[in-house]
Regions:
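Conserved beta-strand hairpin/beta-sheet module of binuclear metal-dependent hydrolase folds
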Residues: 1-47, 85, 145-147, 193-204, ...
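General small-molecule cofactor/ligand-binding pocket signal
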Residues: 5, 89, 113-118, 132-134, ...
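Short, surface-exposed connector motifs at secondary-structure boundaries
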Residues: 26-28, 53-54, 80-85, 255-262
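Active-site neighborhood of phospho(di)ester-bond hydrolases with catalytic His/Asp-centered motifs
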Residues: 34-37, 54-62, 90-91, 202-207, ...
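Active-site metal-binding motif and surrounding structural segment of the metallo-beta-lactamase
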Residues: 38-89, 113-118
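Metal-dependent catalytic neighborhoods of phosphoester/phosphodiester hydrolases
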Residues: 69-77, 98-101, 271-279
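A gly/proline- and charged-residue-enriched helix-loop-helix capping module
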Residues: 96-103, 114-119
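Metal-dependent phosphodiesterase/nuclease catalytic metal-binding core
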Residues: 118-263, 272-283, 299-303
Length: 303
């Protein structure tokens, strides 16, 4: 099970009912935070999300509405007596930016490990998360993120017995570990069937539509994508400032074959957003407006 909570849906500036951009993902006691705009701490408190288990922070880019909440969050994590290292992933220049922001949070009881993205696509495996960082098209260097929880094949007692694998090795093999025992090497594929479908969430904000985004989001259970503008005539502004309209996000969701779309990162000028959703659903039926605190528990498929 993967817990997803959209903490902030505002772009550019916070509003009374919209904190700036942030997304929380929780799996097996570990949290990923994607972006950390102003108000993220309050949004986490409102959603009942603990600060301490955040192990990984993914930053899309260095515009203030996506990173201005970081110094305060680091201080709060330090005050919670956290000692475990925090990994921060972000575009080239991340170390310099984090160092500058830490001017007001200089002494922390935990280590910060910065991973700078340099390639078009980069992949990481941490704490059971498979993270794909993919470059998008904004006014500055910017990345989207797909986070996947993979699922191994079903354990076969029959195969284990056929291969005379000692019962004491079944559990580590079932967990995907290779084991050496009494001079013989045992691998998970000896006892596991084909890999089963996992859970995938893709998050993209601050970009023009790209085939690269469609490819990264393909097959996602949930696609969280910016819809900066809802008014169709604002396509001109979207192109000028490298953002998307509701309808462009819906087109990408349709082409990527995702199960569900949440729109987010709204312009401060956007009001009565619900009025535009019928037109959006004409393009992609399973589209919804993101709201601060909107959450879902994504489950593995029954099989």
């Amino acid at each position: 099970m993967l817990d997803v909570c959209l903490l902030g849906t505002a772009g550019m500036m916070p509003l009374p009912n919209r904190w700036l951009t942030a997304l929380s993902l929780k799996y097996n006691g570990s949290n990923i935070l994607i972006d950390c705009g102003e108000g993220t701490q309050i949004a986490m408190k409102e959603a009942g999300i603990n600060f301490k288990p955040i192990d990984i922070l993914c930053i899309t880019h260095f515009h203030a509405d996506h990173i201005s909440g970081l110094p305060g969050l680091l201080l709060t994590m330090g005050n919670a007596e956290r000692t475990e290292p925090l990994t921060i992933i972000g575009p080239k220049g991340l170390t310099r930016v984090v160092t500058a922001l830490r001017t007001i949070a200089p002494e922390l009881p935990f280590e910060i490990k910065c991973i700078e993205l340099n390639e078009q696509d980069e992949y990481f495996e941490m704490n059971g998360y498979h993270i794909h960082a993919f470059r998008v098209k904004h006014a500055v260097l910017c990345y989207g993120y797909s986070v996947e929880i993979k699922r191994s094949g079903r354990f076969s007692v029959e195969r284990a017995k056929e291969k005379e694998i000692p019962m004491r090795l079944w559990n580590p093999l079932q967990k995907g570990n290779t084991v050496e025992f009494e001079g013989r090497v045992y691998t998970p594929d000896m006892v596991l069937g084909p890999a089963r479908k996992g859970i995938k969430v893709t998050y993209c904000t601050d970009s023009r539509p790209l085939e690269h985004i469609v490819e990264a989001a393909e097959g996602s259970d949930l696609f969280i994508c910016e819809g900066m503008y809802a008014e169709k005539e604002k396509i001109v502004k979207a192109k000028q400032y490298k953002h998307m309209t509701f309808y462009e996000a819906a087109e990408m969701a349709k082409r990527a074959g995702v199960k569900e779309l949440w729109l987010t990162h709204f312009s401060p000028s956007l009001v009565r957003a619900d009025d535009y959703m019928p037109q959006v659903r004409d393009i992609f039926a399973n589209a919804y407006l993101g709201k601060d605190g909107k959450s879902v528990e994504l489950m593995f498929d029954e099989d």
